Each structure stands twice: as structure tokens, then as C-alpha cells.
Amino acid sequence: CGKSRGHNRNLCRCIWMPTQDAVYQNIRYHGKKEGVPVVDDNGRVLSEVVRVMEICAEANIIFATGHSSSEESITLARKAREVGVRKCVVTHANSGIWKMTHDQIKRCIDLGAWMEYSYITNLWGPGTGLPDFERMSDKEFADFARIAPQRSIITTDLGQVGMPHPVDGMRRCILALLENGLAQKQVDFMVRSNPAQLVGLSVSE
């Protein structure tokens, strides 16, 4: 994912920090400090992570925080700015154990990060393929989305057995945002223009 050469040019658009193997997730879900860390015991970003950031900065690749904790994500966003990363995405800022306060989100944005909100929070719960998670209201999701639409992207995080198809999930998300007071232009930022900008695609009017 470093310098693009020959037929491999632009194949890498994003590098995520650990997700299912993240230490934070293992602590919260299993009570065990196992997995792949992103910071040391003093809260400093690991040198290996800094090297990944340097690659992202050099090749203009997205650096995404994965399943890091809220405070870890803020630390990563700060370090990414220091290193020169131009596309830092804070993952799942509205979701489950990664859910941030509005003040934390604003701190990340002030550090130059983009915020990702996943609509899966409004689709899981009892009677679904992910029954053990508490469902978020569409109003609460919209409240996250309206914090800074110009610095946010929306994903579905779908693809699991027993859950809606990602396309259907995105359709439901867009309708929910419009029904809860967001303007079409704001929604377009988050589901169209901003994602395209991050992965280096042009958007036709």
C-alpha cells in the first residue's frame, strides 16, 4: 500500500486498524486484554501504527480507526494529523461500545478527522441476525449525522446473515435521515460526495 507502481496503482484506498481483534473490543466483550493493540500501556500510539500512518500519508490512503475505543480514536486522530495523514476516518462513532459523545466527535473533527456513522445500529436488535444489541432510534442517528455533515460519511456495516441487504439498509437510512429533518444536500454529502472524495472518485452532478 506504499507508493503505487505499474498495474497495482490505486488498488489500496483504506487501511483499517484492528476490528474483531482489537484489544478494546476483547476487553469489553470478553474481559480479556488480548488481541492487537494500537496504543501502549501509557496511551501512546505504537510505533508500528505510526508507520502505517506514514504509509497512508505518503500514498494519500485513508487511515481508519477500526474498533478502537473513543479515547484511542481521538489519540489516533491527533497522531495522524501530526504525521500528515490527510484522510483519517473515525470508525463507528455512533455504534455500540465505540459510541462517542458529541463533544468527542467535535474534538475529532477539530483534529481534521472524518466521522463514520453506521446505520446497522438502527437495524439490529431482537428478531434480527444480531439480536443482542440495543437498537438506536432514527432520531438519535439523525442527531449524530447533523453534527457536521460536511465532515461525515454514512455506511451500513451490513452483510451479516439474518440482516438486511446493504442496499436496502442504505435506502432505509437515507429515508430516515430525510424524515428526521436533514436536508437532501446534507444527506448527499454523507452518502455520496464525501465517500467519493475519500476514495478518490469524481462525483457527477
Language-model-detected regions and their locations in the chain:
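Divalent metal-coordination and catalytic microenvironments
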Residues: 15, 63, 115, 157, ...
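His/Asp/Glu-enriched short active-site or ligand-binding loop at hydrolase and phosphoryl-transfer sites
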Residues: 112-126
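Divalent metal-binding pocket/active-site signature
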Residues: 14-100
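Mid-to-C-terminal alpha-helical segments outside catalytic/metal-binding sites
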Residues: 169-205
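Charged helix-capping and loop-helix junction motifs
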Residues: 1-2, 46, 101-105, 132-141, ...
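Acidic (Asp/Glu)-rich catalytic clusters
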Residues: 5-12, 54, 77-82, 105-112, ...
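Short acidic/histidine-rich active-site segments
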Residues: 148-166
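N-terminal hydrophobic targeting/anchoring segments and the immediately downstream early-domain regions
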Residues: 1-18, 198-204
